[in-house]
Amino acid sequence: MSTTLYDKIFQAHIVDEIGDDALLYIDRHLIHEVTSPQAFDGLAQKGRKVRRPDLTFATMDHSISTRSLAIDACGPANKLQLQTLADNCEANGIQLFPVGHQKQGIVHVMGPELGLIKPGMTVVCGDSHTATHGAFGALAFGIGTSQVEHVFATQTLKQSKGKCMQVKVNGARPLGVTAKDIILAIIGKIGHAGATGCVIEYCGDTIEGLSMEERMTVCNMSIEAGAKAGLIAPDQTTFDYLAGREYAPKGADWDAAVAYWKTLKSDTDAKFDIVVELAATDIAPQVTWGTNPGQVIGVNQPIPAPEDFSDPIDRDSAVKALKYMDIQAGQKLADLTVNHVFIGSCTNGRIEDMRAAAAIAKQGKVAENVTAIVVPGSVAVKAQAEAEQLDKIFLDAGFEWRLPGCSMCLGMNDDILSQGDRCASTSNRNFEGRQGRGARTHLVSPAMAAAAALAGRFADTRDFIAND
């Protein structure tokens, strides 16, 4: 019987079947300081140990300061989280990459760059953006703290099999259109709950033409479409990225692994529950206008009115979003001034993102009304960017160049916005209060964020590219 990539990975990891559910073996468990403490406590209370510490890797990312290497820089509560993670990892023999370690970084940035994620794996983390790792053809999804404890104890997880949605994107990308624009356009088309109950497989010649870092950006925001996970079949681009990385197979093991990885693709006549198609040629640089990622438009489109939506829930959501974001239907995004710009996160904190933003930043100076920060996703990204002197480009233009961490993606550290602030952000969520109480978040690509920083308002990155 013809099967999808999702089917193949799911079936290969079934340890036992429990009614309509399956007990899946977990190949890789990534942890950080926020969702692991209670799981470790539960384990200790029951007198259990971590079953496979060798398959578990930890980093510090959410609660850390991007201004200082001191673990107490974000206050006593965050320090306690970080110290607790360090103590738990030491007690259980888990590899930890703490603040200051050369391999430290945002969990979904450092994992791939170390070669920890491989095609065909099951990957979990107490973090919703675990879907990032689906870019490698791995079944990767976020889990809750009680599930983190279950994986600690058994290296398995009970799961029900979801539907499979195929998203095809074909055609040449227009000037200035990035992977971030592609995934925002997808979410705009299907809605922020459009893939609920599904695993998305992204395909088509546009997707095949993306680099691994671009594929990670696409898969990262699968959760913002309502999906459990996102997948892209591995190919030569995947193999080239993994070759030589620290935790990648070597020698004969590499040859055997690649031979297996080449089988990890949906059969040509596999049936999908839902099929969605987009033409890349129709996509423009995107900006979210509302309070969920599905409320998104091309940079030169007017902000929609509630009556433009046929669904009553969407209409109500639009009314609330317009009020919260302090914008008007019909208004142009170019009329909106921004006072903050954030470039970073597990969505757009990799070296290609730094390069794209720097290509715009070198064309001017940050506007007087704007505070702009650039936060590399890992120590390795920071080092590479500095080797290419990208940090100098940012600093000369008036951006702040920070230490690695999750930073302003979420209001969980010292990079928090204030009431009424408007931010062009390369992160993944624009929910009310996501970057601080009363703050207004607009999701954009790194190039669009850099353009907004220079213009002091939303600007079409294509104008900057044309002048480069």
Swiss-Prot record:
Cofactor(s) listed: [4Fe-4S] cluster
Catalyzed reactions per annotation: (2R,3S)-3-isopropylmalate = (2S)-2-isopropylmalate
Pathway: Amino-acid biosynthesis; L-leucine biosynthesis; L-leucine from 3-methyl-2-oxobutanoate: step 2/4
SUPFAM superfamilies xrefs: Aconitase iron-sulfur domain
EC number, as in UniProt: 4.2.1.33
Domain of life: Bacteria
Gene Ontology MF terms in the entry: 3-isopropylmalate dehydratase activity; 4 iron, 4 sulfur cluster binding; metal ion binding
Pfam family, one: Aconitase
GO biological process: L-leucine biosynthetic process
Cofactor note text: Binds 1 [4Fe-4S] cluster per subunit.
InterPro entries given in the database record: 3-IsopropMal_deHydase_lsu, Acnase/IPM_dHydase_lsu_aba_1/3, Acoase/IPM_deHydtase_lsu_aba, Aconitase_4Fe-4S_BS, Aconitase_4Fe-4S_dom, IPM_dehydratase_rel_enz, IPMI_cat
Residues binding [4Fe-4S] cluster: 346, 406, 409
Keyword Iron attributed: yes
Keywords in alphabetical order: 4Fe-4S, Amino-acid biosynthesis, Branched-chain amino acid biosynthesis, Iron, Iron-sulfur, Leucine biosynthesis, Lyase, Metal-binding
Quaternary structure and partners: Heterodimer of LeuC and LeuD.
Protein family according to the UniProt entry: Belongs to the aconitase/IPM isomerase family. LeuC type 1 subfamily.
Function of the protein: Catalyzes the isomerization between 2-isopropylmalate and 3-isopropylmalate, via the formation of 2-isopropylmaleate.
Listed name of the protein: 3-isopropylmalate dehydratase large subunit
Record lineage: Bacteria, Pseudomonadati, Pseudomonadota, Gammaproteobacteria, Alteromonadales
